[in-house]
Design a protein with these regions (language model features):
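Short, solvent-exposed mixed-charge patches
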Residues: 1, 302-303
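Active-site beta-strand-loop-beta-strand hairpin of nuclease catalytic cores
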Residues: 42, 49-67, 71-72, 250-252, ...
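Catalytic centers of nucleases
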Residues: 1-86
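Short, flexible coil/linker elements and helix-boundary hinge sites characteristic
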Residues: 18, 107, 119, 279, ...
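Catalytic cores of nucleic-acid endonucleases
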Residues: 22, 58-266, 270
Length: 303
C-alpha cells in the first residue's frame, strides 16, 4: 500500500551514499533492498530494508521502513481470511460478524443498482458485496471502530504468517525482514536527501502508541456494467449479495454471517445467471436502463 514512486526515489537516494547520520550516530550501509514474499501472493510490511553497521561499535543493525504518504488512510486492504486470522486470532470470523451487526442497517439502505451517477460511483454500477479493509481513522457509514488491540499486528506485522514476516532479500530469506521497525510519513516531493529520510523516521513502537485506533471499513465491490468489469475478480468479501429472481424481478439476500468466505467473481457469475433468467444478457449490449421495471421493490436503487 505504499507509493511505489516514493519507494524508488528513496532507494535511489540511498544508493548514492555509503554513510549517514541518525540519532547522533554514524552508520555505513551494507545492504539496501525491498523484501518480497516467497512464492508471491502479497507483500511484506517493509518497503525499504537497510542493513547497516553502527560505526561507533561496529555492530550490524537493521532499519526496516514502512513508507506512507501523509494523506494515507488505509492500513490493511485486500484482506483475506488468513490475514484476518493473523490479526484477530482464531475468533476472527466471529469478531468481523460482530462488527457487521453493529452497522447491519446501514448495509440495508445502500443503493445496489445505480441508474445514475452518485458521487464517485458511476452510472451502471451494480453492487456484488463489500470488501473488508482497515483504516487508521475513518467516519464512513460502513465503518466500525475496532475494539480489539491490533495495532502491533497491523503496523509491525506481529503474528503474520512466516512468509510475510521473513521476507526474501536479494534472494535470501531474512528472518523478520518483513516486520518494519520504522515508519516514514512524508510527501514524496520533500524527499531529496538522506537527511529527509532518516531525520523523519518514527519508531513503530512510538507509532503504535499514537495510531492505535483502527476502523474496520466495508467498501463496495461494484460491477461497472458500462466497462464490463469489476476491480478484481478475486477480492474476498466481508458481506456479499446472493442475487436471485423473485416474482420475475431481480432481488437479493444479504449474507452477513460468512465474512471472507466468498470471492467477487462467483458473485458476478451469480448476477449474470439471474439476469439471463429474465431475458437480460449482462455481457452483450447491456444497458443499465434495461433493468428499469425489472428490479424487485426490496432492492434499494439510485435514480
Amino acid at each position: 500500500m505504499a507509493d511505489d514512486g516514493a519507494e524508488i526515489k528513496i532507494r535511489n537516494i540511498l544508493k548514492k551514499i555509503k554513510t549517514f547520520q541518525m540519532n547522533s550516530s554514524k552508520y555505513e550501509i551494507i545492504r539496501l533492498s525491498k523484501p518480497t514474499v516467497l512464492g508471491g501472493g502479497g507483500e511484506t510490511k517493509t518497503d525499504i530494508y537497510i542493513k547497516v553497521k553502527n560505526k561507533s561499535n561496529n555492530k550490524e543493525e537493521e532499519i526496516k521502513i514502512s513508507y506512507k504518504k501523509p494523506s494515507f488512510s488505509f492500513v490493511e486492504n485486500k484482506i483475506k481470511s488468513n490475514r484476518a486470522k493473523a490479526i484477530y486470532g482464531n475468533n476472527w470470523s466471529k469478531i468481523i460478524q460482530e462488527q457487521i451487526n453493529e452497522i447491519r442497517d446501514n448495509f440495508l439502505v445502500k443503493p445496489l443498482v445505480y441508474f445514475e451517477k452518485s458521487g464517485r460511483i458511476e452510472k451502471g454500477s451494480i453492487t456484488l458485496g463489500w470488501r473488508y479493509e482497515m483504516e487508521h481513522s475513518g467516519s464512513r457509514s460502513l465503518g466500525v471502530k475496532i475494539k480489539q488491540d491490533i495495532a502491533a499486528q497491523v503496523w509491525e506485522n506481529k503474528g503474520a504468517q512466516a512468509q510475510y514476516k521473513d521476507g526474501i532479500v536479494d534472494g535470501n530469506e531474512i528472518p523478520l525482514s518483513g516486520m518494519p521497525n520504522f515508519c516514514l510519513t512524508i510527501d514524496p516531493e520533500k524527499i531529496n536527501t538522506s537527511e529527509d529520510i532518516f531525520g523523519n523516521l518514527v519508531s513503530m513502537k512510538k507509532l503504535i502508541l499514537t495510531h492505535g485506533d483502527i476502523t474496520a471499513a466495508f467498501l463496495a465491490q461494484n460491477y461497472r456494467s458500462h466497462k464490463q468489469k469489476q476491480e478484481g475478480n478475486r477480492r474476498h468479501l466481508g458481506v456479499w449479495l446472493d442475487w436471485k429472481i423473485l416474482d420475475g424481478k431481480l432481488a437479493c439476500e444479504y449474507v452477513f454471517d460468512k465474512p471472507l468466505e466468498m470471492e467477487s467473481l462467483p458473485r458476478l457469475e451469480n448476477l449474470d445467471r439471474c439476469l439471463k433468467q429474465i431475458g437480460i444478457d449482462l455481457k452483450n449490449n447491456f444497458k443499465i436502463d434495461l433493468l428499469k421495471d425489472k428490479i424487485h421493490e426490496s432492492v434499494p436503487v439510485y435514480t
